[in-house]
């Protein structure tokens, strides 16, 4: 039986990946493509070069699906390997990829995929249903070990079988509402390459590197890796035998930068064709460059996760939803959007992004109106009086809280923190900050009790289906993806029910109830929804089609590069 909960032994290994993986699909939720955006009416050059992308602060970790964990890794897999289906960037609907069509049984427990017959691996062997069945069964078999990082994509899967070369049948142990939305994210691997590595305990699955300097790389997507340098520049080249629409470009390069100034300079000098994500502070200057286009992509929620663990005892007042509500209405969200994100953000009010509406949830929760007077009134009513220093005292302790900031977003989040500090000082609450490389291990602690922190500024994304966004707040994710330690049995029960409800209307009602619980418990305080800002050379046309790429390397759609072209 598939499970999403990592074993105790693996949890701390997964913690380092958790926040990065949560960013996977933030851009997909708001629509990735857009067309236009710096395009010209000229004809594309007949000799298309490599499109060079610079990424600030983000890098790939591996091109082995059993080892990789960042969104950039999974974006590469979408371009390298077949997938059963994919999201359309135009309307976020699931559309065919390797599977031309699919059907499901009335009870939702059997899925049958009809695969196309013209797909081939780069070594000339055909892509068949056997490859898909092998991939799925291998992940299910080793989900508590070597394939744990892929296990979320096979939730509820019992077995996959190849009925014939182009017919795949997947049997589920129970109906899974988000099955199609998750299974397509699993890259289909060539059985003849990976089967020897899956022998025994599967430990050898982690040994393949997909480094062309060390081994033959076998893929079937529109691009293959030509040069692998995880800390520098990785280059992908076009696969001319790809079964789908052919990209115009010969390939694309992906270079990691730790310093935004170096990346921006490389763009200005012509060493790069595009750079993301740009610090909002530099966007005004770049907009003045005649050769560059600057645009925001996606809709990422920025929130405050307040410690909600019943094991946390230092500041028990934080467990009170009334205190959290007071904190929430003391915050000036519009100020954060305007001064920190320079127009590339808008105030947020719901723990789920409004793009889920109306298919999966009712109208999103309104943005909390700032009301400092009411916040002070609530805290006074709870008996938390201000001391001589202006800081309130609760349960014998000053209301001084440590807020964790993820180093990867240090520049923006430090400025967000400064505004939060100013806002909450108006209601007698003092904040301090601590920058950490990855806050989750520090938050959860070795025993996953969440004893040693007060709050954290969190940012993550979700897939168009809200299952994963809801999943992170379950009790089973304490010590893994759950940022606040929230543990509500009623919520967990609703999550399990919606996960197996294949009637859309009934599932929507369950999700509405879950959102009501999360909002009522003030599990997280939404601040803003922000965009990743990208700049690119205007000589390139249809760069906006790469919206998902700029939201961490597109993982939703293999056709993103199709119209990208350099103008004559």
Regions found by a protein language model. Give the residues of each.
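Aromatic- and charge-enriched surface segment that lines or borders ligand/interaction sites
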Residues: 100-145, 163, 169-171, 263-269, ...
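Alpha-helical secondary-structure segments
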Residues: 52, 128-135, 165-171, 221-222, ...
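Detector for C-terminal structural segments
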Residues: 37-40, 229, 302, 330-361, ...
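N-terminal lobe/hinge region of extracytoplasmic solute-binding protein
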Residues: 54-106, 137, 218-219
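Ligand-site clamp/hinge motif
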Residues: 211, 239-285, 417-418, 430-432, ...
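Gly/Pro-rich hinge or "lid" segments in bacterial periplasmic/extracellular proteins
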Residues: 88, 187-245, 251, 372-373, ...
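Short, low-complexity disordered leader/linker segments with a strong preference
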Residues: 1-50, 159, 373, 388, ...
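Surface-exposed binding/hinge segments that line
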Residues: 149-200
């Amino acid at each position: 039986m598939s499970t999403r909960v990592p074993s105790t032994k693996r949890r701390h290994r997964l913690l380092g990946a958790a926040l990065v993986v949560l960013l996977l699909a933030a851009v997909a939720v708001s629509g990735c493509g857009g067309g236009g955006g710096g395009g010209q009416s000229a004809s594309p050059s007949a000799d298309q070069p490599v499109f060079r992308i610079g990424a600030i602060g983000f890098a790939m970790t591996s091109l082995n699906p059993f080892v990789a964990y960042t969104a950039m890794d999974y974006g590469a897999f979408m371009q390298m390997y077949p997938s059963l289906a994919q999201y359309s960037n135009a309307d976020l609907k699931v559309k065919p990829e390797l599977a031309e069509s699919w059907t499901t049984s009335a009870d939702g427990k059997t899925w049958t995929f009809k695969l196309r017959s013209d797909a081939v691996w780069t070594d000339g062997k055909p892509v068949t249903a056997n490859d898909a069945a092998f991939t799925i069964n291998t992940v299910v078999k080793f989900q508590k070990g070597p394939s744990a990082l892929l296990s979320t994509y096979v939730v509820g899967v019992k077995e996959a079988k190849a009925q014939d070369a182009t017919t795949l049948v997947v049997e589920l142990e129970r109906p899974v509402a988000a099955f199609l939305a998750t299974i397509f994210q699993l890259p289909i691997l060539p059985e003849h390459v990976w089967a020897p590595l899956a022998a025994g305990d599967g430990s050898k699955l982690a040994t393949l590197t997909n480094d062309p300097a060390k081994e033959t790389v076998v893929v079937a997507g529109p691009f293959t890796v030509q040069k692998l340098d995880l800390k520098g520049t990785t280059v992908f080249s076009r696969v001319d035998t790809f079964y789908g629409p052919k990209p115009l470009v010969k390939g694309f390069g992906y270079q990691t930068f730790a310093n935004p100034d170096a990346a921006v300079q490389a763009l200005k000098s012509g060493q790069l064709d595009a750079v993301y994500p740009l610090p909002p502070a530099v966007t005004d200057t770049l907009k003045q460059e005649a050769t560059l286009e600057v645009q925001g992509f996606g809709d990422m929620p920025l929130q405050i996760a307040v410690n909600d663990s019943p094991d946390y005892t230092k500041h028990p007042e934080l467990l009170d939803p009334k205190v959290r509500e007071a904190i929430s209405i003391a915050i000036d969200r519009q100020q954060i959007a305007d001064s920190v994100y320079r127009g590339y953000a808008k105030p947020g009010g719901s723990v789920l992004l409004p793009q889920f509406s109306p298919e999966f949830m009712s109208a999103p929760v309104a943005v909390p109106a700032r009301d400092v007077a009411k916040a002070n009134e609530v805290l006074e009513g709870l008996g938390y009086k201000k001391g001589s220093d202006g800081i309130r005292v609760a349960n014998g302790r000053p209301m001084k809280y440590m807020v964790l900031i993820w180093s990867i977003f240090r520049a923006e989040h430090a400025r967000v923190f400064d505004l939060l500090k100013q806002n909450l000082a108006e209601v007698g609450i003092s904040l301090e900050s601590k920058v950490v490389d990855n806050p989750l291990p520090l938050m959860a602690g070795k025993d996953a009790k969440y004893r040693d922190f007060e709050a954290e500024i969190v940012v993550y994304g979700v897939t168009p289906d809200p299952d994963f966004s809801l999943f992170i707040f379950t009790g089973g994710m304490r010590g893994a993806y759950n940022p606040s330690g929230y543990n509500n049995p009623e919520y967990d029960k609703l999550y399990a029910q919606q996960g197996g409800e294949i009637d859309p209307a009934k599932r929507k009602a369950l999700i509405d109830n879950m959102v009501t619980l999360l909002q009522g418990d003030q599990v997280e305080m939404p601040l803003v929804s922000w965009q990743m800002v990208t700049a690119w050379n205007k000589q390139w046309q249809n760069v906006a089609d790469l919206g998902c790429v700029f939201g961490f390397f597109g993982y939703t759609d293999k056709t993103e590069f199709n119209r990208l072209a350099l103008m004559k």
